[in-house]
Curated annotation (Swiss-Prot):
Organism lineage: Bacteria, Pseudomonadati, Chlorobiota, Chlorobiia, Chlorobiales
Originating gene: pcm
Entry's Gene Ontology cellular component terms: cytoplasm
Localization per record: Cytoplasm
Protein keywords: Cytoplasm, Methyltransferase, S-adenosyl-L-methionine, Transferase
Protein name (Swiss-Prot/TrEMBL): Protein-L-isoaspartate O-methyltransferase
Role played: Catalyzes the methyl esterification of L-isoaspartyl residues in peptides and proteins that result from spontaneous decomposition of normal L-aspartyl and L-asparaginyl residues. It plays a role in the repair and/or degradation of damaged proteins.
Originating organism: Chlorobium phaeovibrioides (strain DSM 265 / 1930) (Prosthecochloris vibrioformis (strain DSM 265))
SUPFAM superfamilies (alphabetical): S-adenosyl-L-methionine-dependent methyltransferases
Disulfide bonds: none
């Protein structure tokens, strides 16, 4: 069955309504989810289910996270970076470009987005999508656990994979009062954590439990079976 843009538009509105019913209230986040066409970031075979609240495999052991998870993380970031009631702005680093959907959501909100992906195929696919859709997102291939020191500091960092601990390199790349949203825990379950820089100190708040693919890299999980570059 060939889906039309009208059908996708209706499904996207229903997805946003569902997010709102499930507690996502940030207006800028909801607006971005209405604007960004998620079906363009899902593999062809999954497009009919692009607006279901479910993760979908994108290859190489990676997934595009379910909409609620993306909205939850994005809301945490948007509520704290830069803070206040106006439209969010600032420089945000995303770790784990994956399908490119999370980066597109951040860009739609109003952030200047930098994104690091460790898997070459996913990096090139996402970069091509950003170019095709005219999205001014800067991305690079590399070890996301080390961040992007040449572009630091960042007002916000969003980590789209589960970490065993908070990577020191990422914390050091936060601007003063900047915040990082990162799932921290074991390989099976992580606690969504908000880390905020206050001078030489880092304050933490913990939220709901989630299950992410592992954050692989020098300051993350070791995975010798995965090609990094």
């Amino acid at each position: 069955m060939e889906w039309t843009e009208t059908q996708f538009d209706r499904q996207r509105r229903e997805m946003v309504d569902s997010l709102r019913r499930n507690g996502i209230q940030n207006p800028w986040v909801l607006e971005a989810f209405q604007e960004v066409r998620r079906h363009l970031f899902v593999p062809e075979e999954g497009r009919a289910h692009a607006y279901d609240d479910a993760a979908w495999p994108i290859g190489y052991g990676q997934t595009i996270s379910q909409p609620f998870t993306v909205a939850y993380m994005t809301s945490l970031l948007a509520d704290h970076v830069p803070g206040g009631s106006g439209r969010p702005f600032g420089r945000v680093l995303e770790i784990g470009t994956g399908s490119g959907y999370q980066a597109a959501i951040l860009e739609a909100i109003g952030y200047s987005v930098f994104s690091v992906e460790r898997l070459p195929v996913l990096y090139h696919q996402a970069k091509a999508k950003f170019h095709r859709f005219g999205l001014p997102i800067t991305c690079r291939l590399g070890d996301g656990t080390l961040g992007w020191p040449e572009e630091a500091p960042f007002d916000g960092i969003l980590v789209s994979a589960g970490a065993p601990s908070e990577p020191k390199a990422l914390k050091e790349q936060l601007a003063e009062n900047g915040s990082m949203v990162i799932p921290v825990g074991n390989r099976g379950m992580q606690v969504m954590t908000l880390v905020t820089r206050k001078g030489a100190r880092f304050e933490r708040e913990q939220y709901q439990n989630f299950a992410f693919v592992p954050l692989v890299g020098r300051e993350g999980w070791d995975d010798k079976n995965t090609l990094l570059y």
